[in-house]
Amino acid sequence: MAEKDSIGDIADDFEEQLVAPAADRVGFLPGLLRWVAIAVGAVIFIVTVVTATALVLAKQGSSHTAYPVSQEFRESRELLQYYESVGLIRTNTADALPGTVVVSVALGYPLNDKTAQQELSARLVELKDFLRSYFQRKTLSELRPEHEQKVKIEIRNEINDNVLSRSKVKDIRFTQFDVLKP
């Protein structure tokens, strides 16, 4: 009987070995699905945290940046179109030891004013000659940065009075304004 018991034990052990590995093995697909579910959950969590953080920061920032401004304090400037075809003007100043002026001028006229645009194009040579002679008459001290606004006003007035006849320039801007001392 002892042999029968030992054979029974062997059979029981063999049976456990056959059944146990099948229960431990889940398979490739369910394991993969588990990792995919973990990754999707992590992505959802990260997106939720980032969105919540962005919303909190946006609410805090908006209260500091939005200031109501009344109509009387808003500056309303006329929209202008700029004529920039004059190009670069290079000339010497009127000093005893002349400096060099290199300037590029943009002439502002009312938006969609075809007359001004046509007249500026037609008088391009006159404009270049006027600007060259204007800067030749000036000294280095008259062309310092603190006098720039005065220079712009003088140029605008002289162009309107002496160069243009059918239209007017409203604004002068320098896209380049270099005064080189000798």
Curated annotation (Swiss-Prot):
It holds the Pfam family FliL. It is a single-pass membrane protein. Keywords: Cell membrane, Chemotaxis, Flagellar rotation, Membrane, Transmembrane, Transmembrane helix. It comes from the Bacteria. The chain crosses the membrane at residues 36-56. One of its GO terms (biological process) is chemotaxis. Controls the rotational direction of flagella during chemotaxis. Belongs to the FliL family. This is Flagellar protein FliL. It comes from Treponema pallidum (strain Nichols). The gene is fliL.
